[in-house]
């Protein structure tokens, strides 16, 4: 398992994940390569979740030559992936390569840039659309958004997700990002202590406008070639 415990979060240290993130940060990486990079990062992250959080069991079966036993991952059919529109769309596409039978939910949420960040380092968040599947106690829930900056958007999204969860909770609740800022990790961790925060990188600087530095820019704009 290539995940490092960083106190407030678990950092994916897989070499290919770090390589892919470096490509995403690079301004010379054009739209198609950027989008494909997010897909790849989602798939790697999915495999890391399987390796680090899911159990296996031995099962009997037949090969073309004989009877034998082998390991199979349990819980692959009990995964719920929440796509925070729109930047997470290619990220989630990669997750679905690891969890092809996952149920999917979408939440369209974004911060009010015109209102700006308040004295507590939070943005007002607008939620335009919510569509979530049924969530059961045995489910592994993955809420995916490439950038976790102030944590304002993620906390709002998690409010909606946890409202749909059973009272007893779920098997695992992951908050998955490509790049995170310490302020956002602390905010999400404080408000949702049962969530496992999983990221590929933690960048130290958050600007007064709420952008992560060095970061990778606006993931949605770079993936969809919009400004």
Curated annotation (Swiss-Prot):
GO MF annotations for this entry?
Answer: GTP binding; magnesium ion binding; uracil phosphoribosyltransferase activity
Q: EC no.? A: 2.4.2.9
Say which domain of life the source belongs to.
Archaea
Name what cofactor the protein needs: Mg(2+)
Q: Enzyme class, one word?
A: transferase
Q: Where does uracil bind?
A: 212, 217-219
Pathway where it operates? Pyrimidine metabolism; UMP biosynthesis via salvage pathway; UMP from uracil: step 1/1
GO cellular component entries:
cytoplasm
Residues spanning the signal sequence: none
Q: Name one Pfam family in it.
A: UPRTase
Q: Which UniProt keywords apply?
A: Allosteric enzyme, Glycosyltransferase, GTP-binding, Magnesium, Nucleotide-binding, Transferase
Q: Which InterPro entries match?
A: PRibTrfase_dom, PRTase-like, Upp_A, Ura_phspho_trans
Give me the residues that bind 5-phospho-alpha-D-ribose 1-diphosphate, please: 86, 111, 145-153, 218
GO BP: UMP salvage; uracil salvage
Q: Where is coiled-coil annotated?
A: none
| Stated regulation of activity | Allosterically activated by GTP.
| Residues that coordinate or bind GTP | 36-40
Report which reactions are catalysed by this protein: UMP + diphosphate = 5-phospho-alpha-D-ribose 1-diphosphate + uracil
Protein role: Catalyzes the conversion of uracil and 5-phospho-alpha-D-ribose 1-diphosphate (PRPP) to UMP and diphosphate.
> Which family does this protein fall into?
Belongs to the UPRTase family.
Q: What is this protein called?
A: Uracil phosphoribosyltransferase
The gene from which this protein is expressed is: upp
């Amino acid at each position: 398992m290539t995940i490092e415990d960083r106190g407030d979060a678990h950092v994916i240290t897989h070499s290919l994940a770090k390589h892919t993130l470096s490509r995403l940060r690079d301004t010379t990486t054009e739209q198609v390569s950027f989008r494909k990079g997010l897909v790849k990062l989602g798939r790697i992250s999915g495999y890391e979740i399987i390796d680090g959080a899911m159990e296996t069991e031995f099962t009997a079966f037949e090969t073309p030559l004989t009877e034998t036993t082998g390991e199979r991952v349990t819980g692959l059919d009990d995964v719920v992936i929440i796509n925070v529109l729109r930047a997470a769309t290619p990220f989630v596409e990669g997750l679905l390569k690891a969890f092809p039978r996952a149920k999917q939910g979408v939440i369209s949420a974004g911060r009010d840039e015109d209102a700006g960040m308040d004295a507590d380092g939070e943005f007002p968040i607008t939620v335009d659309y919510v569509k979530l599947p049924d969530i059961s106690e045995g489910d592994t829930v993955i809420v995916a958004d490439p950038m976790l900056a102030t944590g304002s958007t993620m906390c709002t999204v998690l409010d909606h997700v946890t409202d749909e969860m059973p009272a007893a909770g779920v098997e695992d609740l992951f908050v998955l990002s490509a790049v995170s800022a310490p302020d956002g990790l602390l905010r999400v961790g404080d408000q949702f202590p049962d969530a496992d925060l999983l990221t590929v990188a933690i960048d130290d600087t958050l600007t007064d406008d709420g952008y992560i530095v060095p970061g990778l820019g606006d993931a949605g704009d770079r993936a969809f070639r919009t400004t």
